[in-house]
């Protein structure tokens, strides 16, 4: 067994994902999810060597109790694994302009994450709770923060500055930051390997499609544009997020329809997207089932989702100049051959030609090209953000 193990923590507001990752191979030794924090049925599920386990955490428990359970109840059963953990790696959604790469956590880093909390009010406070819980449970291990926004810090000003008064950026940091950076980094790197090219000479467009979704143009291994903005709300149609809309709709909802700003924020983040259009579900699998059954709302939601995505992909050929591959990843990108086919058909101007057999095969964790050899390459690469976090954690300890 490797001695390069890292405990990776991804703390949400009401959940905590964890995995013990071999930084050399990307294999997980143990992985799991603690969820329903603050509720009576707070629980934890985990998997070891394909075997699944579940336990109650106790009513109204949260991050600290979950980390303590991982240490005492799970790792306590696998002391050989626990002894080889070299670091704790934390996913942090927003690092603003302060953090352009992964860092070892100290008091100044914690203060910086707190400063960025206004840009990610649902995520950064939860990450801080997880960091403090991990520090209490693993006082002797270094803690590393890996930021979703860091990969996008290579974008030029023309891509990240909004057409608002410049002082709003200069004085308040209002700009495009982007998300899913760790995923876009991983799949763009893997795409270069699959193409047999040097990363510095590889131009790809990465579509990370899940309940949250974003597209990134990656030129020579660096992000040059991305669809999410100041927050994850901008860009594509998502599970419950609206993505791009006319900003004046906000004022129409408030002034004409009597919404409060909090209600508008909730509407755009939690009631829109696939759920709002379909009036059925935010789950893409349910949308596809509805589409197959002729459900009008599901059909419209699917068409808008694919159309918006194809438009973004087409526009991102502009900063690249040359496209070596289009890469699909994330839960939807890795598993929905229907959506991939629809998007590629909408991109007919680029001469993508779907290979039905390849497209069917590239699902459920299988990587591969999904187009014929007669035109541009589109491929599926399953993401592995935890591996990137583990690699960064180990590299920072050298």
Curated annotation (Swiss-Prot):
Q: Which UniProt keywords apply?
A: ATP-binding, Cytoplasm, Kinase, Magnesium, Metal-binding, Nucleotide-binding, Transferase
Pathway of action: Metabolic intermediate biosynthesis; acetyl-CoA biosynthesis; acetyl-CoA from acetate: step 1/2
GO terms of biological process kind: acetate metabolic process; acetyl-CoA biosynthetic process
Top-level taxon of origin: Bacteria
Cellular component GO terms, alphabetical: cytosol
* Feature type site, description Transition state stabilizer: 180, 241
GO MF, one annotated term: ATP binding
Checking InterPro entries in the record gives: Ac/propionate_kinase (IPR004372), Aliphatic_acid_kin_short-chain (IPR000890), Aliphatic_acid_kinase_CS (IPR023865), ATPase_NBD (IPR043129)
Reactions mediated catalytically: acetate + ATP = acetyl phosphate + ADP
Task: Recite the UniProt cofactor note for this protein.
Answer: Mg(2+). Can also accept Mn(2+).
Compartment list: Cytoplasm
> What is the annotated role of this protein in its UniProt record?
Catalyzes the formation of acetyl phosphate from acetate and ATP. Can also catalyze the reverse reaction.
Give the NCBIfam families listed for this entry.
ackA
Subunit text: Homodimer.
Family statement: Belongs to the acetokinase family.
The protein depicted here goes by the name Acetate kinase
Native species: Shewanella loihica (strain ATCC BAA-1088 / PV-4)
């Amino acid at each position: 067994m490797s001695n390069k193990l890292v405990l990776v923590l991804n703390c949400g507001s009401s959940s905590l994902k964890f995995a013990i990752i071999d930084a050399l191979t990307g294999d997980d030794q143990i992985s799991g999810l603690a969820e329903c924090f603050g509720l009576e049925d707070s629980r934890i599920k985990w998997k070891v060597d394909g075997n699944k386990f579940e336990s109650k955490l106790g009513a109204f428990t949260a991050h600290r109790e979950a980390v303590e359970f991982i240490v005492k109840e799970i790792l306590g059963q696998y002391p050989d694994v626990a002894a080889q953990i070299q670091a704790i790696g934390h996913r942090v959604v927003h690092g603003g302009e302060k953090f352009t790469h992964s860092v070892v956590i100290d008091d100044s880093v914690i203060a910086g994450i707190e400063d960025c909390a206004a840009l990610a009010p649902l995520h950064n406070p939860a990450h801080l709770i997880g960091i403090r819980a991990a520090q209490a449970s693993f006082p002797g291990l270094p803690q590393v923060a890996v930021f979703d926004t860091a990969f996008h810090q290579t974008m030029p000003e023309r891509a990240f500055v909004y057409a608002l008064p410049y002082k709003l950026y200069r004085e308040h940091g209002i700009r495009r930051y982007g998300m899913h950076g760790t995923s876009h980094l991983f799949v763009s790197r893997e795409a270069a390997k699959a193409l047999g090219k040097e990363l510095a000479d590889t131009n790809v467009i990465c579509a990370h499609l899940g309940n949250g979704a974003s597209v990134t143009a990656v030129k020579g291994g660096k992000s040059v544009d991305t669809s999410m903005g100041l927050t994850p709300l901008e860009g594509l149609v998502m599970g419950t997020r609206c993505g791009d809309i006319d900003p004046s709709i906000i004022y129409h909802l408030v002034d004409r329809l009597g919404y409060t700003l909090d209600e508008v924020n909730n509407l755009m983040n939690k009631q829109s997207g696939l759920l709002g259009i379909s009036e059925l579900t935010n789950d893409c699998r349910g949308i596809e089932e509805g589409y197959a059954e002729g459900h009008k709302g599901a059909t419209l939601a699917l068409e808008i989702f694919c159309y918006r995505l194809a438009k973004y992909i087409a526009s991102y050929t502009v900063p690249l100049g040359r496209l070596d591959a289009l890469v699909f990843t994330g839960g939807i990108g890795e598993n929905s051959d229907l959506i991939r086919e629809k998007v590629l058909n909408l991109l007919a101007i680029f001469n993508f030609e779907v290979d039905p057999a390849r497209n069917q095969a590239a699902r459920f964790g299988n990587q591969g090209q999904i187009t014929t050899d007669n035109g541009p390459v589109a491929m599926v690469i399953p993401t592995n953000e935890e591996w990137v976090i583990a690699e960064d954690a180990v590299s920072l300890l050298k």
